[in-house]
């Protein structure tokens, strides 16, 4: 994983990253970018939309500095969690993360050093996402880290649209006191999850999204635009408190 000196102009770093990509990765990335241009509009009914529940495990909590260790993603379409439509990758690190981080994620130093090439893993994730909307719990963190790493490793600005499940849940189920992913999992009586594992957290996010999509029409949420508006309104309310 190359680490570019951040004192240099960003566009120069991006060009260098693009030039360093193998031809096969550049071609895959070109197809993904072209496909995204044909993405469905915000008027698409929720029943027809494909969502991707995404979770990232990182080398630390600093979203502007730390790197992605692992990616877990699960598709939700036709209001079903698609267990056969998932993506998981462990990204190779230049050096293993700190011991306390390893204890949290249970991904040892040797595993980290032997992971997948980061550019390959990120292109694979973008291919899996396609033109779908990405859903994450506390999405600001995942979106910031993902977009930064795509820019650093691939030389492009990431284009997936992130929806924050932490804002959607109270928008559709007002009056609850839940805050964390574990709180919501327990609230709906879902099976306990193996926390701090990307694919496990992605499955939990997908199950909670399913519950939101089933209840959304009762709140007048019928389209992707309605879902976006409900999320944004809830985030605005959260900032006002």
State each model region's role.
Residues 2-41, 208-241:
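Acidic two-metal-ion nuclease catalytic site recognized across multiple nuclease folds
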Residues 18, 22, 27-147, 157-159, ...:
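Conserved non-catalytic scaffold segment of RNase H-like nuclease domains
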Residues 56-60, 167, 204:
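Short, glycine/acidic-enriched loop or turn micro-motifs at the edges of active sites
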Residues 132-140, 144-150, 176, 180-241:
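Acidic, Mg2+-coordinating catalytic module of metal-dependent nucleases/exonucleases
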Residues 151, 155:
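Short, surface-exposed basic-aromatic patches at helix termini and helix-loop junctions that form
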Residues 163-178:
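Short alpha-helix plus adjacent loop in nuclease-associated cores
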């Amino acid at each position: 994983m190359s680490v570019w000196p951040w004192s240099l102009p960003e566009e120069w770093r991006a060009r260098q990253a693009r030039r360093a990509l193998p031809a096969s990765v550049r071609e895959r990335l070109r197809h993904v970018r072209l496909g995204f241009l044909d993405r469905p509009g915000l008027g698409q009914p929720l029943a027809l939309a494909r969502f991707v529940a995404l979770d990232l495990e990182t080398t630390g909590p600093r979203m502007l500095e730390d790197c992605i260790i692992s990616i877990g993603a699960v598709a939700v379409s036709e209001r079903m969690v698609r267990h056969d439509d998932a993506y998981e990758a462990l990204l190779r690190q230049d050096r293993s993360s700190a011991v306390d981080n390893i204890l949290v994620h249970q991904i040892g130093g040797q595993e980290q050093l032997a992971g997948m090439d980061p550019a390959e893993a990120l292109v694979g994730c973008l291919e899996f996402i396609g033109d779908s909307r990405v859903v994450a719990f506390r999405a600001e963190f995942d979106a910031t880290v993902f977009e930064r790493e795509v820019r650093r490793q691939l030389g492009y600005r990431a284009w997936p649209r992130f929806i924050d499940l932490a804002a959607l849940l109270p928008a559709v189920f007002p009056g609850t006191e839940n805050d964390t992913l574990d709180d919501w999992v327990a609230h709906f009586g879902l099976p306990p999850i193996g926390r701090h594992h990307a694919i496990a957290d992605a499955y939990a996010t997908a199950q909670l999204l399913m519950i939101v999509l089933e209840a959304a029409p009762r709140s007048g949420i019928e389209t992707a635009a309605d879902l976006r508006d409900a999320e944004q309104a809830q985030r605005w309310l959260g900032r006002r408190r």
